[in-house]
Amino acid sequence: MKTTNVKNNNNNINNTDEEIKIKNNYNQNDERLKKIKENKFDWALFKRFINIIKILYAKPVIPLTLFLILFGNGFAQTYVSKFTGILLADIYASFTSGDKVFFLSSVLKAGFAIGGSALLAAIINFIVSIMAWNWRKTLCLYIQNVYFKKSLFYKILAFDDRIDNPDQRITSDIDNFTTLLASIVSQCITGPMVVVYYTYLCYTTIDWYAPLIVYGFFFLGYLINKLVMSPMVSINYLQDKLEGDFRSLHQRIRNFSESIALYSLSKEKQHPEKRFDNNDYDHGYESDDSDQSCDESTTIINRKKNKGSQYYKNKNSTSKKINDFIDKLSGDSNDQKEELLVEEEQAKIQFEALLKNKKRVIFWQLGLNTTSDLFTYLSPIANYFIIAIPVFFLNNKSVLQPGDVTVQSYNCIMLASGFSQYINVSQSISDLSGYISRISSMIEVCKKIMEDVSLDADITKLNEKVAQTHNNDAIINTGSSGNISLNNGDSITLDDVTYFTPKGNQLYSKISINVKRGNNLLIMGPSGSGKSSLIRIINGLWPFFKGSIDRPENGDMFFLPQQPYLIFGTLEEQILYPFSKKQKRIPKSIMRELFQRFEIDYLLDRERFIKKSAQVNDLTHNWLNQLSPGEQQLIAIIRLIYHKPKFALMDESTSSIPQSLEERVYYVAKELGITIISVGHRISLLKYHSTLLRFDKDKNWYLEDIINQNNQSNNINNNNNNNTNKIAEDSVFD
């Protein structure tokens, strides 16, 4: 190999204000914790709620129709309930008069009235369920559309700590929010009707003081509930976050169950005296391993578990006594001496944090339920006190008839029930508030990322750069100081590119390379040196902060990761991805030829057997578990060959396949005109590339020409040549 260019960037690292700003943008944990504390029942929460309502009613025909139907049924139910009170009074009157016929007719009429009310209540519940279903559909599709646009989901998962567990927010949080909202809307529709109608009846059957006393009684209840409910918003918000974290931990254990089991076996074979001390792991724990920062960072070993557990210690002695008491009731014990797996220990710590906050929810819920139930159960006493006022306190010596007592009592109770709906719904509102905060914050952060506000780019400098390009539409603004321009697919050029890890640590500066079509580039270096990071930057997944990149359009580039991504679908759908069967189809003969070319045509036979066995679910859901890592990589390579891009970015994409097949991959790619930028460690990769970009542990980079002494075409037999040419000439690639 001949070294043509050597660059050392150690002297080029300047902590400018711009770089400091960039680093700070990735340290968002404090901001997220601050947002948890700031979630409370206030005007800001109401404005967030209004923004969600605008989304739900963006297409107003169906939701407004359901709302009007609900309103009509609520009005009918309120009106029918009036006759229930009158008929109950008639039943009491029949007892005093001894009129049997009048009694039977009153019971029959009351039965019809109550039956009608029950039917209307069932219809209302049905409409509420339909409203929740429609709202969930609207809101979920809206957020999913934003979430998947321009790979926004990757930016959120890789860079942004402000949104924890976005999967939970899209799935369960939206479902719970819409269900609660529909229930609250139903009560808020019927509640005002009941209040207005029975305010009038109480005024006409008793006097002005009757509705006034009921109003004052429940206004006092509202104030008390407001004081109790406000802190519960942030507590419920935190509880939802902890529930999501706990679920994600077990999801990760499920995904890496085999690796965890194998590691645990090796742990059992080690003797305690031969193991490293925990202090050995503390030194140099925080590394700049950018390649692993987005994939597998913290689930294998938690070397800071002692510090993490101290966070959950209870500092309040009174609360600690209560917690210990509850632990005794539940049978918890801290005397367990059995050595736990790291994953079990992490799950235990996470679960303890979840339970601790759940206790807070339970205690605050106790206060809220107490105040709500207190005013609900005191309402009958307030009712009889109102009826007693004209008899005992206004010198009105007339004795009320049983029928009058029944009607007046019923009217007061119904008025109180209208207010009770608002008191009882306060618990639902506290839960709803947490969902509002989580859903709206996700929408807000997604919009900010789409607008590049989250990266806090220097707008002045961005405008200057746009002006310098004469407003060229081909310039893609990355929200940072780096620019990506698109060409016709002839080359990939990096000019003075400087990039960082997601934590804000600089990797390399002023990288300049030019990869022309037909000249493969190999990137080599130690693990964690930033090789994969450079691939992500070229793809546009990661921002870079200095320099420029000139590359083909996305449709002319194809990315193959080390761990292939297999969708839920058939083998044909695996090859078509990222397209679907609705957009393209592959003839069976071409499928067979492609799979034979890379010696995995037996998978097609296996698929045919699965279809004959009618194991459709196994076919569409378990390919990832059924295939070896090498088979998965070969399917991804066939996907690349089928799509035939101008450039392929391969991140150790052949690490699990034999070298004979690896050689075939590069030869087929060359025959099809696919230029490859490879990341790898194998020395055997050198002969397939013309240029080497080498990184070292000191953050130096070297660009070298590769003198290939082997003619790779001589290593592949003529039969392979004929097959390759046949595939390359097939119209399916055109």
UniProtKB/Swiss-Prot annotation:
CC terms in the record's Gene Ontology section: ATP-binding cassette (ABC) transporter complex; peroxisomal membrane; peroxisome
Family designation: Belongs to the ABC transporter superfamily. ABCD family. Peroxisomal fatty acyl CoA transporter (TC 3.A.1.203) subfamily.
GO molecular function: ABC-type transporter activity; ATP binding; ATP hydrolysis activity; ATPase-coupled transmembrane transporter activity; long-chain fatty acid transmembrane transporter activity
Entry-linked PANTHER family: ATP-BINDING CASSETTE, SUB-FAMILY D MEMBER, LYSOSOMAL COBALAMIN TRANSPORTER ABCD4
Name of protein: ABC transporter D family member 1
Composition bias type Basic and acidic residues, residue spans: 271-286
SMART domains named in the record: AAA
Composition bias type Low complexity, residue spans: 712-725
Coiled-coil regions listed in the entry: 332-359
UniProt signal peptide: none
Subcellular location: Membrane
Domain ABC transmembrane type-1: 63-351
Alphabetic keyword roster: ATP-binding, Coiled coil, Membrane, Nucleotide-binding, Transmembrane, Transmembrane helix, Transport
Membrane disposition: Multi-pass membrane protein
PROSITE patterns per the UniProt record, alphabetical: ABC_TM1F (PS50929), ABC_TRANSPORTER_1 (PS00211), ABC_TRANSPORTER_2 (PS50893)
Catalytic activity: (9Z)-octadecenoyl-CoA(in) = (9Z)-octadecenoyl-CoA(out)
InterPro entries: AAA+_ATPase (IPR003593), ABC1_TM_dom (IPR011527), ABC1_TM_sf (IPR036640), ABC_transporter-like_ATP-bd (IPR003439), ABC_transporter-like_CS (IPR017871), ABC_transporter_sub-D (IPR050835), P-loop_NTPase (IPR027417)
Keyword Repeat set for record: no
Record-level GO BP terms: fatty acid beta-oxidation; long-chain fatty acid import into peroxisome; peroxisome organization; very long-chain fatty acid catabolic process
Highest rank taxon of the organism: Eukaryota
Region (Disordered): 271-296, 712-734
Positions contributing to ATP binding: 525-532
